């Protein structure tokens, strides 16, 4: 079975509940794999290096720790000289040489925009990679997928991805700023480390899952604009997840939210 240890919400940020994870590992010897998402979906929060290492250093556990970094290219750091792309430096990949039980997974589906090729990558020490190679299906990567992956991971492809990611990060900043002016929207939750924004929908000043669902259906069915209703997920009461688009797409979403949430019957 699955042992679930919910994230904790500290203010607007989601984080691993390290003490409870360690307690679960100490008391349940049946656990063989730990999955951590950094950044998470829909939390949009990058996990701290300290929390990942705390799990890796657990003396009561010798199974695998798998860190899913599907959204790793979207966080940023605020620097004195402006915005700096830091996707590589915040990855857990550089911990792999120090931990034989660590596997870090990434994908071409998000920042590279190649979801159709269905291709990802795992970083781990050679013995673990050998086990994966021994158990995977033969010829599991098609020739077209391999071709597009090689193009994406070329110096030119990575430069293009980084340029697009910088644009998205700026669009995300503008979207968050614009959402602050929408009536009956509450806090933006998470650290906004992914290509989406998680925001609370309010009724009478409190997060309302019912109203979030109403707005979600109105946007999709009446206006053809799809966001994600995440209000049923733990810690996400009343929340919609809005993917970051172009400035024009973001402006349309903000205008529609303003229209719907300014209407008491929405």
Question: Across the structure, where does each feature detected by a protein language model lie?
Answer:
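PLP-dependent aminotransferase class I/II
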Residues: 95, 101-181, 187-189
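Conserved PLP-binding catalytic core of the aspartate aminotransferase-like
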Residues: 168-169, 181-223, 240, 244
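Conserved active-site segment immediately N-terminal to the catalytic lysine
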Residues: 63, 78-109, 127-131, 240
């Amino acid at each position: 079975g699955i042992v679930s240890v919910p994230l904790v919400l500290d203010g607007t940020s989601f984080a691993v509940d390290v003490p409870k994870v360690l307690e679960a590992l100490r008391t349940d010897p049946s656990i063989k794999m730990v999955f951590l998402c950094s950044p998470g979906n829909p939390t949009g929060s990058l996990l701290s290096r300290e929390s990942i290492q705390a799990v890796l250093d657990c003396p009561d556990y010798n199974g695998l720790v798998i860190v899913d970094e599907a959204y790793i290219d979207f966080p940023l750091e605020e620097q004195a000289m402006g915005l700096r792309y830091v996707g590589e430096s915040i990855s857990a990949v550089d911990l792999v040489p120090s931990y034989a039980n660590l596997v870090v997974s990434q994908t071409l589906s998000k920042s590279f925009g190649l979801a159709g090729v269905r291709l990802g990558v795992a970083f781990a020490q050679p013995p673990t990679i050998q086990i994966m190679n021994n158990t995977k299906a033969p010829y599991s990567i098609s020739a077209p997928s391999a071709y597009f992956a090689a193009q994406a991971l070329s110096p030119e492809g990575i430069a293009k991805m980084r340029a697009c990611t910088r644009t998205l990060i700026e669009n995300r900043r503008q979207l968050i700023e614009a959402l602050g002016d929408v009536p009956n929207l509450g806090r933006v939750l998470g650290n906004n480390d992914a290509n989406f924004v998680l925001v609370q929908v309010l009724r009478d000043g409190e997060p309302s899952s019912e109203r979030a669902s109403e707005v979600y259906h109105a946007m999709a069915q009446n206006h053809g604009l799809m966001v994600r209703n995440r209000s049923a997920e733990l810690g996400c009461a009343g929340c919609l997840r809005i993917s970051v688009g172009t400035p024009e797409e973001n402006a349309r979403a903000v205008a529609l939210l303003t229209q719907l949430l300014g209407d008491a019957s929405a």
